[in-house]
């Protein structure tokens, strides 16, 4: 799988803005546009490149996918085992899921649970931000493992947040 940062000509950054991603996508799309090609083989190649450009932009626009791309690109060799989830975090996720289920028929309870999950999500987002920046600035086994763990926790809490909003 191609590095989406390389495809768009962007520096690898967790904090890349939507505006920067869209601007890079436009710039690359203009340069690779199939209408700029005259022969069928070049058009087909340009069409493939355009598809890769759009896929790279989509990947970078989603923070979880962007994080996965960074983790993939900075994966140590040999690849260490993925970190195990913290049992306390897993227990907390079970508690939140139970709270969501119990609050399913009461709007006030549902809102309270959603607010609690949103607060915990903000904390995990900050932790993920720090872990990803550390990985980019100091790519080592320890920072890679911390970034993978943070992304896994972020993914789990986002799922819980989506469930609480239903």
Model-inferred region functions:
Residues 1-166:
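C-terminal accessory/regulatory regions appended to core domains
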């Amino acid at each position: 799988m191609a590095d989406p940062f390389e495809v768009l000509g962007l520096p690898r950054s967790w904090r890349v803005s939507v505006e920067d991603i869209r601007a890079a996508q436009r710039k690359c799309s203009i340069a690779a546009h199939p209408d700029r090609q005259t022969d069928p083989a070049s058009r087909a190649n340009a069409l493939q490149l355009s598809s890769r450009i759009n896929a790279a932009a989509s990947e970078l626009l989603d923070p979880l996918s962007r994080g996965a791309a960074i983790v993939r690109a900075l994966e140590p060799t040999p690849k260490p085992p993925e970190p195990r989830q913290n049992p306390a975090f897993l227990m907390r996720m079970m508690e939140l899921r139970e709270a969501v289920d119990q609050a399913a028929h009461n709007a006030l309870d549902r809102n309270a649970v959603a607010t609690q999950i949103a607060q915990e999500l903000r904390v995990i987002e900050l932790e993920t931000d720090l872990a990803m920046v550390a990985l980019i600035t100091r790519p080592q086994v320890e920072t890679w493992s911390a970034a993978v763990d943070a992304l896994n926790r972020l993914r789990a809490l986002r799922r819980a947040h989506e469930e609480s909003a239903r």
